[in-house]
Regions:
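Vicinal oxygen chelate
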Residues: 2-31, 41-136, 143-150
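Short, surface-exposed ligand-recognition loops at beta-strand->loop->(often short) alpha-helix junctions
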Residues: 33-36
Length: 150
């Protein structure tokens, strides 16, 4: 078969990018940079009931994709060469995560039991039931739900 016909046949068999792209939903997934990725995966499982969807690497140096009841996020060890720093390296945070759940009191208590530190307790404020913890890796999580409209 001539080379030109062969390349046309290959292109015909290749999946259409348009078909693949139309099946992808637009989402935003935070990527947490920290120190101790392996320990972080275990913490998020214990604290929030996260499930591990993907992991590359072993020990404490990992890249992982996790899900908390369908809400996905990524984590990895900091990599200064890519300008990704942990809160510990920065001396602070640049983003807070809001975890919206049906029972913020239970999830908050579970996170604290797993090793998170309370920043402020779960209370009712601004039409939300909301509390805030900082995880052992320096990331702040607001755990809450909107109040029901009566």
């Amino acid at each position: 078969m001539p080379a030109s016909k062969k390349s046309r046949n290959i292109r015909k068999r290749a999946p259409s990018r348009r078909k693949v792209a139309s099946k992808i939903a637009t989402t935003i997934a935070p990527w947490l940079c920290l120190r101790g990725g392996g320990r972080a995966v275990e913490f998020y499982k214990a604290a929030f009931g996260a499930t591990e969807l993907f992991r590359m690497g072993d020990g404490d140096s990992v890249v992982a994709r996790l899900s908390i009841q369908g809400a996905e996020f990524w984590l990895s060890d900091e990599s200064p060469e890519h300008h990704n720093f942990s809160p510990e390296s920065l001396g602070g945070i640049t983003v807070r995560i809001i975890l919206t759940v049906a029972d913020p009191d239970a999830v908050f208590a579970r996170a604290v039991k797993a090793g998170a530190k309370e920043v402020y307790p779960v209370t009712e404020e601004h039409d939300w039931r909301l509390g805030r913890v900082v995880d052992p890796f320096g990331h702040h999580w607001e755990i809450g739900r909107p109040m029901a409209d009566d």
